[in-house]
Amino acid sequence: MAKKPKQLRNKPRKSFSTQTFTVVVLVLFVILILVGLGIFSLPSTNKTSSMPMDLTTIVQTIQERESFGDEEDGNGDRWLEVISWEPRAFVYHNFLTNEECEHLISLAKPSMMKSKVVDVKTGKSIDSRVRTSSGTFLNRGHDEIVEEIENRISDFTFIPPENGEGLQVLHYEVGQRYEPHHDYFFDEFNVRKGGQRIATVLMYLSDVDEGGETVFPAAKGNVSDVPWWDELSQCGKEGLSVLPKKRDALLFWSMKPDASLDPSSLHGGCPVIKGNKWSSTKWFHVHEYN
């Protein structure tokens, strides 16, 4: 007697709703990973927000806060503020401690000399009326405190320490200034030491009673929208300006994201009207600075 053929049992199929739920969970999981890595950001629910390029929106935008010191030591919290997208400029508030500011000033005082500028024809440093401050350079890794500051700057900029020049400490007295200029080079000599300058970090080591702003005359946007507009000197109102505040660090890029030079990074130091201005500058190059 012939055996009946065995009937093949079909495996139970997942319902369409189950498959959809699985896909949704996977998509949400991927989105959470991207948000955590900072690659993707969730849309803002603020209905009153302006367009991204509006200075009213991007000024005073807090991107990061971290506990740092307390009210007694006067160091406050560290937080990052977007100043401009053209040029790309950011202020890291309370980047330095009071002690670090005083340390850099004390290191520089014994060797201060009249500041110079780069001659575009020869690549050498020369005297110029456009720069009337005094200053000195500190070797990279001059001491443990300087090295700690330099490493922190690299963490802030994501540029290796070896791509940076040594810190330059500057002192401006009443009436002293630095006319608007670009930090990138126009000569063929200076680029041999590490390529073109890509970014600048300017740290303010002292408060200034009046004047001494860092001004960007070619910045895009309505520069009068900044909340500190009424505090600016006449020079400071000639462009987008940053007030010199002790412990703050200003980062701006001399190159665009496509590695082309950014003319809007034109900047200058306004004359000090009242008080003294101490600052420290770190220039970064495309390659290792030799």
From Swiss-Prot:
Catalytic class of the enzyme: oxidoreductase
Membrane topology according to the record: Single-pass type II membrane protein
Transmembrane segments: 20-40
Residue positions binding Fe cation: H181, D183, H267
PROSITE patterns, alphabetized: FE2OG_OXY (PS51471)
Domain (Fe2OG dioxygenase): residue spans on this chain: 163-286
Cofactor(s) recorded in Swiss-Prot or TrEMBL: Fe(2+); L-ascorbate
Annotated residues for binding of 2-oxoglutarate: K277
Subcellular location field: Endoplasmic reticulum membrane
Keyword Transmembrane helix in annotation: yes
Keyword flag Heme: no
Keywords from the UniProt entry: Dioxygenase, Endoplasmic reticulum, Glycoprotein, Iron, Membrane, Metal-binding, Oxidoreductase, Signal-anchor, Transmembrane, Transmembrane helix
GO molecular function term, any single one: L-ascorbic acid binding
Reactions catalysed, as given in the entry: L-prolyl-[collagen] + 2-oxoglutarate + O2 = trans-4-hydroxy-L-prolyl-[collagen] + succinate + CO2
Topological domains annotated Cytoplasmic: 1-19
Record topological domains on the Lumenal side: 41-290
Co-factor binding comment: Binds 1 Fe(2+) ion per subunit.
Enzyme Commission code(s) on record: 1.14.11.2
GO annotation, cellular component aspect: endoplasmic reticulum membrane
Residues carrying a glycan: N46, N222
Functional summary from the UniProt entry: Catalyzes the post-translational formation of 4-hydroxyproline in -Xaa-Pro-Gly- sequences in proline-rich peptide sequences of plant glycoproteins and other proteins. Hydroxyprolines are important constituent of many plant cell wall glycoproteins such as extensins, hydroxyproline-rich glycoproteins, lectins and arabinogalactan proteins.
Similarity annotation: Belongs to the P4HA family.
Protein name: Probable prolyl 4-hydroxylase 8
Organism name: Arabidopsis thaliana
